[in-house]
Swiss-Prot record:
GO CC term (a single one): cytosolic large ribosomal subunit
GO molecular-function terms, A-Z: mRNA binding; structural constituent of ribosome
Annotated protein name in UniProt: Large ribosomal subunit protein bL12
Assigned keywords, A-Z: Ribonucleoprotein, Ribosomal protein
Subunit organization: Homodimer. Part of the ribosomal stalk of the 50S ribosomal subunit. Forms a multimeric L10(L12)X complex, where L10 forms an elongated spine to which 2 to 4 L12 dimers bind in a sequential fashion. Binds GTP-bound translation factors.
Keyword set includes ATP-binding: no
Gene name as annotated: rplL
Length: 126
């Protein structure tokens, strides 16, 4: 029995019509008692189950998008939120866009966003 390489098989399949390929798949399924559609259905079921979990997000990243013209107030707000020192808070603000908080609870993230926006910064939650 001759052994064919993947390239040789792909070349042979490439020369077949869709009808011929469909017949081949049916014959393959019968001979080896497998079903070609089963893995696709399982993947679709897993993907469908994962979607609702994504909607119920409970951890957020607070991203400082832009500082605005009140840089000192934004640095003070960053220090209050993160307990960073002055130099670290200034470096964070100067490096915008940057994460101020990561994996924060929704309540804490919204509170931090409000504080930063009140100080004059542009903020987004991800």
């Amino acid at each position: 029995m001759a052994k064919y390489t993947n390239d040789e098989l792909l070349e042979a399949f490439g020369e077949m019509t869709l009808v011929e390929l469909s017949e081949f798949v049916k014959a393959f399924e019968e001979k080896f008692d497998v079903e070609a559609a089963a893995p696709v259905a399982a993947v679709a079921a897993v993907a469908g189950a994962a979607a609702p979990a994504e909607e119920e997000k409970d951890e957020f990243d607070v991203i400082l998008s832009a500082v605005g013209d009140k840089k000192i107030q934004v640095i003070k707000a960053v220090r209050a939120i993160t307990n960073l020192g002055l130099a670290e808070a200034k470096a964070l603000v100067d490096g915008a866009p940057k994460a101020v908080l990561e994996k924060a609870k929704k309540e804490d993230a919204e509170k931090a966003k409000a504080q930063l926006e009140e100080a004059g910064a542009s903020v987004e939650l991800k």
